[in-house]
Amino acid sequence: MKTVVVTGASKGIGRAVAKEFANNGYNVVICYNKSLSDAQQSLNEVSQTTRAIAVKVDVSNEDDVKNMVEITKKTFGNIDVLVNCAGVSDTRLLIDSTKEDYDFVFDTNMRGTYNTCKLVGREMLSNQSGKIINISSIWGLRGGSCESVYSASKGAIIAFTKALAKELGPNGINVNVVAPGFIQTDMTKNVTEEIKQEIMESSALGRLGTPEDVAGVVSFLASEKSEFITGQVISVDGGWLS
């Protein structure tokens, strides 16, 4: 049985991804940082269909990530798939931002992706196989007003992924990006109904996305059907960028 590690799996897109892999027969490692109760809910839902564990890990801390990798290896053996869903946002004018705001976003979004890809990537290199899917955002492709730092962090993930795909490809490891559009999660719950309506009207499909929309694409990129796809960015945005 294959094993997937999902960061940011306590809720939102990460939880949906964990459930998708559970339904596909994977062992699932639910990585969370803050909310034990949310992680426990994810674990309860995922454990109904597969073997799963929850591991507390601050992805910006390399020692935490090392510990998570060791726990995963002892519990399940190899790591076959890594999905980096852990992320934070910060909405404000750039001129009002602080160094701490910048560090908060980049430490989780970019440094976290770097740490997990580096340490899980070592395990995948030993096995000469693996799939890595990093979650970015359409703001990493186009940029969002009042989200310059967040957009930059998500753009960095895209550039990082493209480079890593070239680095790991000769060893049978695929590395891709999923760039969600407006997805209905806790991160977007404070967006006004007026703005939501504007987003729906400007997208080709005329609706907002769900975590399950993203999870389905992630599942495809982890499957054998995507063996010849690497270094790519797939937007899951209802045609908003089209």
Where are the predicted features?
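Substrate-binding pocket helix/loop in short-chain dehydrogenase/reductase
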Residues: 93-94, 98-106, 188, 199
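C-terminal substrate-recognition "lid" of short-chain dehydrogenase/reductases
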Residues: 129, 173, 207-236, 241
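Alpha-helical segment proximal to the catalytic Tyr-Lys
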Residues: 122, 166-170, 227
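Conserved glycine-rich cofactor-binding loop
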Residues: 10-11
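Residue(s) in the substrate-gating loop at a strand-loop-helix junction
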Residues: 137
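Conserved glycine-rich Rossmann-like NAD(P)H-binding loop of the short-chain dehydrogenase/reductase
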Residues: 24-41
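Active-site helix of classical SDR
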Residues: 117, 153, 161
